Amino acid sequence: MDTVSLAWAALMVVFTFSLSLVVWGRSGL
């Protein structure tokens, strides 16, 4: 696994986490 794919994987994880965090915050959890 090269550095570029690893960086993309990390970016997707962070993006998904922050997006779900925003959704949870908006729904009043």
Curated annotation (Swiss-Prot):
<dbReference type="GO" id="GO:0009535">
    <property type="term" value="C:chloroplast thylakoid membrane"/>
</dbReference>
<keyword id="KW-0812">Transmembrane</keyword>
<keyword id="KW-0793">Thylakoid</keyword>
<keyword id="KW-0249">Electron transport</keyword>
<dbReference type="GO" id="GO:0045158">
    <property type="term" value="F:electron transporter, transferring electrons within cytochrome b6/f complex of photosystem II activity"/>
</dbReference>
<dbReference type="GO" id="GO:0015979">
    <property type="term" value="P:photosynthesis"/>
</dbReference>
<dbReference type="GO" id="GO:0017004">
    <property type="term" value="P:cytochrome complex assembly"/>
</dbReference>
<keyword id="KW-0472">Membrane</keyword>
<dbReference type="Pfam" id="PF03742">
    <property type="entry name" value="PetN"/>
</dbReference>
<keyword id="KW-1133">Transmembrane helix</keyword>
<comment type="similarity">
    <text>Belongs to the PetN family.</text>
</comment>
<comment type="function">
    <text>Component of the cytochrome b6-f complex, which mediates electron transfer between photosystem II (PSII) and photosystem I (PSI), cyclic electron flow around PSI, and state transitions.</text>
</comment>
<keyword id="KW-0150">Chloroplast</keyword>
<dbReference type="GO" id="GO:0009512">
    <property type="term" value="C:cytochrome b6f complex"/>
</dbReference>
<comment type="subunit">
    <text>The 4 large subunits of the cytochrome b6-f complex are cytochrome b6, subunit IV (17 kDa polypeptide, PetD), cytochrome f and the Rieske protein, while the 4 small subunits are PetG, PetL, PetM and PetN. The complex functions as a dimer.</text>
</comment>
<dbReference type="InterPro" id="IPR005497">
    <property type="entry name" value="Cytochrome_b6-f_cplx_su8"/>
</dbReference>
<keyword id="KW-0602">Photosynthesis</keyword>
<protein>
    <recommendedName>
        <fullName>Cytochrome b6-f complex subunit 8</fullName>
    </recommendedName>
</protein>
<dbReference type="InterPro" id="IPR036143">
    <property type="entry name" value="Cytochr_b6-f_cplx_su8_sf"/>
</dbReference>
<keyword id="KW-0813">Transport</keyword>
<keyword id="KW-0934">Plastid</keyword>
<feature type="transmembrane region" description="Helical">
    <location>
        <begin position="3"/>
        <end position="23"/>
    </location>
</feature>
